[in-house]
């Protein structure tokens, strides 16, 4: 695994379609959610209203009157003023319309919960840019990009909705989010318990900070996914790195690698680390999107894509050339399952510049997640967690240095037992589950485990191929939400 790129590519799952210039250790600090394609169509057409709310740029200072328009979406087809509820999606690091169209669970349960659906865009993403074209100009303009400010936006928006929508004032609100959005949903319930009666935090790695979990747990889970999906699959990948290193020592070897991997551009010796990072990122992405049915994010993928990949990686005890030819076949499943791609492009691609820049700044300030590999418990080249290296890159890119302890100071780390009404769901296939809450903390801080689930599978729309484990998870989640709604109305009745 790359010396400084490992940490960053682990988080680089925001749609790669625009190239931007970022320092090496910042490039892959993309995001926690799945790769997104702005041109991809949702599985089911969604009907919603697009609205805007004027937010303060700084909720915590009193010497500025600067405001910006936060975008949010509302769908009220099934909402009932009597006995209804509001499901509030705490927006992630990206365009809110994509999250709206790809969080089918909320749409599926809206009628049952008599719910209005609200999807709130996170500041500094999508159209919710506090300083317009100057939003990413420098660290002074980015200074208000924090989870705390985003949570305050959500609180102000909920107050606005309850003030302005007849019938909404006395209804319970439930926060829902996935990945970073799931972290925000949990933190919102912790920090603003009077605003939401509960939270569903799907695939939310709230403990992937400091030393709360081992730094190698993420890549260990990725490796387990491949090991369980085919005999000798992970071992083939583990041996591929040395094969690449040996073949790249000569000009003829580089030429052979370029052809064998069907790359769009000739490899040079300076490209090898990037090549290995790109391959590693592919295996990580596959672990996140290992869904039980065909899906389409960056490109079409088959059902259970890791099993398909592992069909080509059954024998690690072959020559370097044959092993890497097999690696190409495996990569081709991810990058060219449709058969439309003529060559594989390892040149740097990331999300739209604004989205990637926003998240790389967050990863340089408060969202500091340690990652490492050792090549023994995982199938990657050894890489140690190096905070100083990250800090130096962040300072050169943004003029800021990370505060690795701030998230645990703000939100409590593992000391959260005083909070209530949060469901933490995690898929066992999802590498982010290593930093998630996977065991009940109290009777009201509940963990739901999905044995056949990848990254927030439970938030996706229902599918005929959904495994029993995700059906049970969704059923449990709805049951908890119904209990929160019932308790809210019971309490309101007693007060009158």
UniProtKB/Swiss-Prot annotation:
<dbReference type="GO" id="GO:0004185">
    <property type="term" value="F:serine-type carboxypeptidase activity"/>
</dbReference>
<comment type="function">
    <text>Cleaves C-terminal amino acids linked to proline in peptides such as angiotensin II, III and des-Arg9-bradykinin. This cleavage occurs at acidic pH, but enzymatic activity is retained with some substrates at neutral pH.</text>
</comment>
<feature type="active site" description="Charge relay system">
    <location>
        <position position="455"/>
    </location>
</feature>
<keyword id="KW-0121">Carboxypeptidase</keyword>
<keyword id="KW-0458">Lysosome</keyword>
<comment type="similarity">
    <text>Belongs to the peptidase S28 family.</text>
</comment>
<feature type="glycosylation site" description="N-linked (GlcNAc...) asparagine">
    <location>
        <position position="345"/>
    </location>
</feature>
<dbReference type="GO" id="GO:0043535">
    <property type="term" value="P:regulation of blood vessel endothelial cell migration"/>
</dbReference>
<dbReference type="GO" id="GO:0060055">
    <property type="term" value="P:angiogenesis involved in wound healing"/>
</dbReference>
<feature type="glycosylation site" description="N-linked (GlcNAc...) asparagine">
    <location>
        <position position="415"/>
    </location>
</feature>
<keyword id="KW-0378">Hydrolase</keyword>
<keyword id="KW-0645">Protease</keyword>
<feature type="glycosylation site" description="N-linked (GlcNAc...) asparagine">
    <location>
        <position position="336"/>
    </location>
</feature>
<feature type="glycosylation site" description="N-linked (GlcNAc...) asparagine">
    <location>
        <position position="47"/>
    </location>
</feature>
<feature type="disulfide bond">
    <location>
        <begin position="233"/>
        <end position="310"/>
    </location>
</feature>
<comment type="subunit">
    <text>Homodimer.</text>
</comment>
<dbReference type="GO" id="GO:0003085">
    <property type="term" value="P:negative regulation of systemic arterial blood pressure"/>
</dbReference>
<dbReference type="GO" id="GO:0008239">
    <property type="term" value="F:dipeptidyl-peptidase activity"/>
</dbReference>
<dbReference type="InterPro" id="IPR029058">
    <property type="entry name" value="AB_hydrolase_fold"/>
</dbReference>
<dbReference type="GO" id="GO:0005764">
    <property type="term" value="C:lysosome"/>
</dbReference>
<dbReference type="GO" id="GO:0006508">
    <property type="term" value="P:proteolysis"/>
</dbReference>
<dbReference type="InterPro" id="IPR042269">
    <property type="entry name" value="Ser_carbopepase_S28_SKS"/>
</dbReference>
<feature type="active site" description="Charge relay system">
    <location>
        <position position="179"/>
    </location>
</feature>
<feature type="glycosylation site" description="N-linked (GlcNAc...) asparagine">
    <location>
        <position position="101"/>
    </location>
</feature>
<feature type="propeptide">
    <location>
        <begin position="22"/>
        <end position="45"/>
    </location>
</feature>
<feature type="disulfide bond">
    <location>
        <begin position="215"/>
        <end position="372"/>
    </location>
</feature>
<dbReference type="Pfam" id="PF05577">
    <property type="entry name" value="Peptidase_S28"/>
</dbReference>
<feature type="signal peptide">
    <location>
        <begin position="1"/>
        <end position="21"/>
    </location>
</feature>
<keyword id="KW-0325">Glycoprotein</keyword>
<feature type="active site" description="Charge relay system">
    <location>
        <position position="430"/>
    </location>
</feature>
<feature type="glycosylation site" description="N-linked (GlcNAc...) asparagine">
    <location>
        <position position="317"/>
    </location>
</feature>
<feature type="region of interest" description="SKS domain">
    <location>
        <begin position="194"/>
        <end position="334"/>
    </location>
</feature>
<feature type="disulfide bond">
    <location>
        <begin position="364"/>
        <end position="394"/>
    </location>
</feature>
<keyword id="KW-1015">Disulfide bond</keyword>
<protein>
    <recommendedName>
        <fullName>Lysosomal Pro-X carboxypeptidase</fullName>
        <ecNumber>3.4.16.2</ecNumber>
    </recommendedName>
</protein>
<dbReference type="InterPro" id="IPR008758">
    <property type="entry name" value="Peptidase_S28"/>
</dbReference>
<keyword id="KW-0865">Zymogen</keyword>
<keyword id="KW-0732">Signal</keyword>
<feature type="disulfide bond">
    <location>
        <begin position="264"/>
        <end position="343"/>
    </location>
</feature>
């Amino acid at each position: 695994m790359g010396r400084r790129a490992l940490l960053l590519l682990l988080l680089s799952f925001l749609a790669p379609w625009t190239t931007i210039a970022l320092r090496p250790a910042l490039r892959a600090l993309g995001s926690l959610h799945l790769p997104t394609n702005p041109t991809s169509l949702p599985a089911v057409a969604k009907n919603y209203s697009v609205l805007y709310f004027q937010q303060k740029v700084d909720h915590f200072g009193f010497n500025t009157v600067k405001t910006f328009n936060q975008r949010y979406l509302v769908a009220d087809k099934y909402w009932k003023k009597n006995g209804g509820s509001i499901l509030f999606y705490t927006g992630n690091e990206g365009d809110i319309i994509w999250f709206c169209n790809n969080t089918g669970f909320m749409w599926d349960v809206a009628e049952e919960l008599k719910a209005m659906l609200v999807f709130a865009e996170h500041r500094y993403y999508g159209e919710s840019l506090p300083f317009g074209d100057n939003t990413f100009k420098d660290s002074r303009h980015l200074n208000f990009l924090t989870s705390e400010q985003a949570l305050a936006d959500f609180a102000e928006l909920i107050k606005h909705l309850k003030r302005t929508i007849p019938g909404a004032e006395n209804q319970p609100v439930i926060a829902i989010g996935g990945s970073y959005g799931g972290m925000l949903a949990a933190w919102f319930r912790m920090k603003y318990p009077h605003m939401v009666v509960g939270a569903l935090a799907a695939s939310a790695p709230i403990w992937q900070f400091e030393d709360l979990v081992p730094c190698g747990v993420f890549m260990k889970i990725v490796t387990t996914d491949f090991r369980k999906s085919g005999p000798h699959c992970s071992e083939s990948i583990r041996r591929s790195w040395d094969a690449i290193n040996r073949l790249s020592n000569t000009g003829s070897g580089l030429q052979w690698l370029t052809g064998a991997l069907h790359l769009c551009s000739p490899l040079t010796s300076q490209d090898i680390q990037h090549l290995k990072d790109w391959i590693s990122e592919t295996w990580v992405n596959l672990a996140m999107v290992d869904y039980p049915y065909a899906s389409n994010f960056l490109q079409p993928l088959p059902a259970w894509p890791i099993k398909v990949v592992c069909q080509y990686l059954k024998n690690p005890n072959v020559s370097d050339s044959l092993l890497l030819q097999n690696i190409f076949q495996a990569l081709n499943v991810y990058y060219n399952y449709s058969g439309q791609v003529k060559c594989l492009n390892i040149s740097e691609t990331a999300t739209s510049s604004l989205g990637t820049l926003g998240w790389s700044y967050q990863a340089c300030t408060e969202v500091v997640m340690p990652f490492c590999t050792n090549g023994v418990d995982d199938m990657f080249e050894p890489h140690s967690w190096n905070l100083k290296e990250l800090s130096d890159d962040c300072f050169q890119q943004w003029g800021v240095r990370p505060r690795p302890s701030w998230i645990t100071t703000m939100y409590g780390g593992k000391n959260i037992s005083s909070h209530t009404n949060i469901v933490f769901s995690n898929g066992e296939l999802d590498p982010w589950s290593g930093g998630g809450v996977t065991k009940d903390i109290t009777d009201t801080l509940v963990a739901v485990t999905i044995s056949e689930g990848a990254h927030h599978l439970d938030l996706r729309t229902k599918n005929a191929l959904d495994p029993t484990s995700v059906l049970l998870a969704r059923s449990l989640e709805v049951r908890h939400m119904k209990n929160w709604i019932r308790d809210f109305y019971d309490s309101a009745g007693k007060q009158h």
